[in-house]
Amino acid sequence: MITLIGTGHVFDLSAALLNIFEEKEPEIIGVELDPQRYQAIMLRNTDPTTYHAAKKNLPIIYKMLAQFQENMAEQYGVNAGDEMLTAINYAQSHQLPVAFIDTNAQQLFVHMWKIMPFSEKFKLLFSGVAGFFVSKKRVEQELKHYQENFDSYIQEIGKKFPTIKRTLIDERNEYMVLKLVSLHEKHQKIVACVGDGHVPGISALLQEKQIPFETIRLQELQKPHIQEMNGSSAHFSINYKPF
């Protein structure tokens, strides 16, 4: 069984995630990171000066996205990617293996930028600059729109930024599913933490491959009663696909 958890990289989800891990008792925990991004997050927390110096060599759009996430996470009192560190730290403290299930982010962004039409690059850069001035309230409004109208939201992204949708969403979904299928062949109980926007696509691909899974979405993680549970009696609204 794969438990697929939809997270948000700028929200404080630690308490909810720990409750789920205690409830599910996984044999292995997968995270939407590649080893290089994990090392970068650790460097950010242990040596900020070196981390910021290293960021100068990253692709420009990668840097813009990372900075936007860091700015928004700061408004929520966390660091971007803290939910992935929560998962990794839990695994390490319980002597569980960790699986990095995402593709190499830097290579992905270089490839995406190379194949992206100029018009899409221009729109993306403009949106990226505008993103630095987005308020917490606006992010929450967008999140509500996304949660209530996921299909139309993804369609909008596909129309405005087709290369981004194909590269950052669709192709990564396929890559992560291959990783999850490989884990499923070796482990009975798997918990995987991925960005919530990947959950529908990954779910559809797992269903095609007849892999049993359940999902816990970001909206559920953010409910106060989930955050406040002590882990002994956690219950979630779960979409279960038995085969």
Language-model segments: what does each one mean?
Residues 1-243:
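Compositional signal for N-terminal targeting/processing segments
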